[in-house]
Regions:
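Residue-identity detector for glycine
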Residues: 14, 39-40
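Short linear segments in intrinsically disordered or otherwise low-structure-confidence regions
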Residues: 3-5
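Active-site pocket-lining/capping segments in soluble small-molecule metabolic enzymes
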Residues: 44-193, 198-342
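Cationic, low-complexity basic patches in intrinsically disordered or flexible, solvent-exposed regions
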Residues: 12, 35
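N-terminal secretion targeting segments of exported proteins
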Residues: 7-10
Length: 342
């Protein structure tokens, strides 16, 4: 059966930004199908690496999940692995993206990632930092600890150029990730960002996820840096995304500011994975295997720091766990014969 070309949702056809990227995607659709059939993508990746949310926030979940991932590898897809776990403790001035709420001892967190050979990332993506914030004792202590005590290199997700320059000077053993909070919606922005030597990874705005023609024009070294945000639930026509992130940055700085009110359709429902799956920018496991890996991409970010651990577990089940073993994982982590929901 022939695959149908992707259709633009009717409610988005007036949004110029999304329609531009949609047009690029549509133009490349048939060429991409032809290349896949003919084996035209010569840099096919053999392994996808997931960058998972909640280093501090979901420590208890990972303390149960990671031993299972190691001892029962047959439960999980052999084409994927864990590239990193990212997050930030509560009350970090440098924090951004989401307000951190993790309370676990950073040494315990690092001990867990060290035991399983996983890179730990600090989410320090505040976009509004000033010179006086660079001396923050808590954030500096975290960077020093992460640079010193993890044999697998640790990283920092960063937005501020001021902070990036500071970290490069004071913590040169850390690697750096360009944050999705920059809201890179223009492909030339992404191309330029991936050309920067200081960034090992770059997370573009999710609205570039399906710009296949342009994405495939990147050099392989640039493709290796691109880290796609897979499960975003934000409305694809949103024009307030950067302001939303700035609101979080102000809160982390302790500034008095009004709550950002999301005006997107269905915003009152909050995050729903089923809704995210309907997002035109959603990247599912078939997309990863059949499109992105054959094109030469291998890094995929799962969002979820501000959600509950039950939903994050569902992400781990969907993206990493074979369907026939998903119940096994639930039973190993929380499900027993006496659990009541109501």
């Amino acid at each position: 059966m022939r695959s149908a070309s992707p259709l633009a949702p009717a409610e988005l056809r007036g949004n110029r930004l999304w329609m531009r990227n949609y047009a690029i995607s549509l133009r490349s659709w048939h060429n991409r199908k032809k290349l896949l059939r003919e084996g035209g993508y010569t840099m096919k990746q053999e392994k996808a690496y997931y960058h998972l949310p909640g280093l501090f926030e979901f420590y208890e979940l990972y303390r149960e999940f990671l031993p299972l991932f190691r001892t029962h590898r047959e439960y999980f897809y052999d084409w994927c692995d864990i590239g990193s776990i990212y997050g930030a403790p509560a009350d970090c001035v440098w924090g951004g993206g989401r307000a951190g709420f993790g309370e676990h001892d950073p040494k315990e967190v690092l001990a867990l990632t060290r035991e399983y050979g996983i890179s730990a990332r600090l989410t320090f993506s505040n976009s509004l930092l000033r010179e006086e914030h660079l001396s923050d004792k808590k954030c500096n202590a975290l960077c020093a600890l992460f640079e010193r005590e993890n044999p697998v290199q640790s990283g920092v997700i960063v937005h501020s150029e001021l902070l990036l320059d500071y970290l490069k000077t004071h913590y040169p053993q850390l690697y750096f990730v360009s944050s999705t909070t920059k809201v890179l919606t223009e492909f030339q922005q992404l191309r330029a960002e991936t050309a920067r030597e200081e960034f090992r990874y770059v997370v573009p705005d999710f609205r570039l996820n399906k710009a296949f023609g342009e994405l495939d024009s990147l050099l392989q070294a640039q493709k290796d840096k691109v880290e796609f945000l897979c499960n975003e639930c934000c409305w694809v026509g949103c024009r307030d995304r950067k302001r939303c992130y700035e609101n979080v940055s102000r809160k982390n700085l302790g500034e008095a500011c009004p709550e950002h009110i999301c005006t997107a359709p269905g915003a009152e429902e909050g995050y729903r994975f089923s809704k995210a799956m309907e997002n035109p920018g959603f990247i599912g496991i078939r997309d990863i295997q059949d499109v992105y890996m054959p094109m030469g991409f291998s890094n995929f970010k799962i969002e979820g720091r501000g959600l509950g651990s039950a939903l994050v577990l569902e992400f781990l089940l969907y993206y990493m766990t074979k369907p026939e073993y998903q119940l096994h994982v639930r039973e190993a982590i929380y499900l027993d014969n006496m659990l009541d929901l109501f």
